[in-house]
Amino acid sequence: SSAASDVYKRQVSSFGSYAYSENEDTFFIDLYAGGTVKTEKGITLTCETDFPHGGTAKYTIKGEAETTVAIRIPAWSEKSLLTVNGEAVDLNAVTKDGYAYITRAWKDGDTLALTMDMTPHVVYASAKIAADSGKVCVQRGALVYCAEEVDNGKVLPLYVKAGAEPKALDFEPETLGGIVPVEICLLYTSPSPRDV
């Protein structure tokens, strides 16, 4: 419909305001999107990334300015590594409210690189929501994998084995427009395969 098309156009045209924001003293990186952006302080950041399938986002600086760059450290990444010009930054010392704040005199060619933990893990639904009680999904980075009955038929007799650790497989560019499949051990508890 025309209305849906207009909403899509507005969202696409406003993507930059979701990816980056800026106030008088800090430039915020909210999303790890490839491309180039110029700050009000006069430096330009170019991002090379393999996100969301990979866990790296590297920003190369062009220009010079003394300012703060704050990059979002995602809560799902248990072991993030942030470097400036290849040297590790102590995230505990610079992180506040989910952002790592780096204040320095940025110079032409400086790099800011974030490596995120992409280890897949099982996420259990809240028991407070009766309809979801006992259900799980697998999360790898920002992506959530699940098998829903509407897409897969009756999957209720399948259970994630206690202590099962999901494993990420190799990237498959032709599957679902490109995806890293995740493998996990399931238990089948129905007496007959016909029940699935």
What are these regions (language model features)?
Residues 1-62, 95, 104, 111, ...:
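C-terminal beta-rich recognition modules with glycine/proline-rich loops and embedded aromatic residues
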